[in-house]
Amino acid sequence: MIHTLETTVAGRKMKVDFGKTGMLSNAAIFMSYGDTVVMINANASKAPREGIDFFPLSVDYEERLYSVGKIPGGFIKREGKPSDKSILHARSIDRPLRPLFPKGYRNDVQIVNTVLSVEQDNLPEILAINGSSLALCLSSIPFTTPVAAVSVGLVDGEFIINPTVAQRENTILDLTVCATKERVMMVEAGGQEIDEETMYSAIMFGFQECKNIVAFQEEAVAKFGKTKNEPILYKADEEVEKEVKEFAFDMIKEVMYIMDKDERNAQLDKVKEKISEEFSEKYEDKKADIAEVIYKTQKEVVRNMLLNENRRPDGRSFDEVRPISCEVGILPRTHGTGLFTRGLTQVMTVATLGALGDVQILDGIAEEASKRYMHHYNFPSYSVGEVRPLRGPGRREIGHGALAERALEPLIPSEEEFPYTIRLVSEVLSSNGSTSQASVCGSTLALLDAGVPIKRPAAGIAMGLITSDDLEKEKVITDIQGIEDFFGDMDFKVAGTEKGITSIQFDTKIAGLSDNCVRDALEGAKKARLHILGKIKECIPEPRKELSKYAPRTEIICIDPEKIRDVIGAGGKIINKIIADTNVKIEIKEDGKIFVTSNNEPEGVKKAISIIEGLTKEVVQGEIYLGKVTKTTNFGAFVEILPGKEGLVHISKLDFARVEKVEDVVSVGDEILVKVTDIDNQGRINLSRKDAIAKKEEEKDK
């Protein structure tokens, strides 16, 4: 049986169709918003997965190019692996949903979002979050708390829910809010230095609209939702838990109060060995239960320390940032480097400048675009002292790279101000919490060292949270380290300048954040951010005046757009010859701006510009030019006076005396002075050598 339900969000129709497709899926829905359609399929394994200590949730976001009427490029002509954007959207769906599954649920759950139709005014990624929540709620999978999502823009001082393409072009805020009907679950934002109060108001504005979408989901569940399965929840054996806790609690507590991380970890390993010696024979088949009890005991001790004893594992106050050091210029041949250290977290970011032609072309379901500024993040195993194979970037690395990229994007100068492509690479050298925000700080240092005239320096910080089981008591923590992140309830990352916020990403491990918690986290992050910015400015107060001697050099010239064809030539013949002869890169814009770039050959840039100017320069009647003879005939000589522009010197105009043979006066390859005597209505240029000589003699006499 097919079930349909509709509602209105921001003046546009949102609709769900259930039972129409995917008859063998636990739940399959068509979710539409305007002409944007996403199909969501939710399924779960029948039994828990054995031998794991986590919830195996898998979220996929699949973009189909037919959704926008495109055929994939390349030889294969079909979609390949998910794009970085698809991976980011999948992570955005995962984060608000994961905390709302029952604790101890170990069944495999997969949510597949397939984008079928896209109207650019209505973002499919926002619809996919709503659809994933609704599909889970309609299924028999034990997920019962609906989550809604909206996009919030800020145009001319007004907040807008789910802004259209035209509105997104003018917004100074790009905010995604996910919430239940009671609390905010997840926020992602990019903004042009938004103040904390405005950001808080925007989040609350989005939260209110989320409540309406949650009500829509609840109505759908009440009308045609499936009966929920009784979940099988993992729980450590009660006898094992009791005995291990009695034996080890005091030892674990003593260890967790050690401030030094390395010493704490070393002592914890010894405690685990003692526990193993004590119980390995008695509970030989209960090793997973023993590990679970150790984890729960550590968590209990750390959370009690923070929540009830007002003490942090490393002894800092709750609003204190770890010791910071900043360095620049540490690599001799790169274009810019920044080494940022905060406690045991250390990131080195390297800036590389390239020609405008080095931009990354983005090909997907969105409108065609390119990226002139990009940030990549690498998290090798040695950063946490572990041994594992080095592979390509995973979802986490892609997500952290995008987050740091978004933090600095509003501060990057325009291509007119700084005509270069910019690539930043953040190498995590040591990780003990908030490496993504350390990457923001390292990136700022690298950009300043590279001489990039960013609007203002940016910095980032991660805020944490500890709450009581009933969520009544909560404490916000500044600059969380690894242990506080691992056992805490929130990771609230905020980056920005002294003027305002440029990016936010937060998610929780509990059923959402209170309004006060959001406000406190924003204010705490501002205080910490200003402190870090002070340290950055002490290291390098402004961008370097000169680029690295190893960086490319770019010059800009402007020509009449009508002359672009003269520079390119038939089939690109002329421009390719210029590039080959001068060893430069040339980028031509539709408005007539031409960017000429060379790595280490400034003379090549000058030569290329000279050629381009010659190609686009108009021949002026009455002017004298130094030209090169390209051809001789029995009636005269053809002379190139500007690149691609030739005129004829008639034999009678070659000399004052009578000339019997052209070759008696000039030969091919000779450079001679000529005067433009006439340009006829067909554009043919008539030249005179003797008039040029006469004029020069006249000027000499004066």
Swiss-Prot record:
Protein's GO biological process: mRNA catabolic process; RNA processing
Record carries keyword Protein biosynthesis: no
Record's keyword annotation contains GTP-binding: no
Entry-linked SMART domains: KH, S1
InterPro entries reported in the protein's UniProt record: ExoRNase_PH_dom1, ExoRNase_PH_dom2, ExoRNase_PH_dom2_sf, KH_dom, KH_dom_type_1, KH_dom_type_1_sf, NA-bd_OB-fold, PNPase
GO cellular component terms, A-Z: cytosol
Domain KH, first and last residues per copy: 552-612
Reported cofactor(s): Mg(2+)
Binding site residues for Mg(2+): D485, D491
Reaction equation(s) it catalyzes: RNA(n+1) + phosphate = RNA(n) + a ribonucleoside 5'-diphosphate
Group of enzyme by EC: transferase
EC number: 2.7.7.8
Domain S1 motif per the UniProt entry, residue ranges: 622-690
Disulphide bond pairs: none
Sorted UniProt keywords: Cytoplasm, Magnesium, Metal-binding, Nucleotidyltransferase, RNA-binding, Transferase
Compartments reported by the entry: Cytoplasm
GO molecular function annotations of the record: 3'-5'-RNA exonuclease activity; magnesium ion binding; polyribonucleotide nucleotidyltransferase activity; RNA binding
Function: Involved in mRNA degradation. Catalyzes the phosphorolysis of single-stranded polyribonucleotides processively in the 3'- to 5'-direction.
Family label: Belongs to the polyribonucleotide nucleotidyltransferase family.
PANTHER family: POLYRIBONUCLEOTIDE NUCLEOTIDYLTRANSFERASE (PTHR11252), POLYRIBONUCLEOTIDE NUCLEOTIDYLTRANSFERASE 1, MITOCHONDRIAL (PTHR11252:SF0)
Protein name: Polyribonucleotide nucleotidyltransferase
UniProt source species: Clostridium botulinum (strain Kyoto / Type A2)
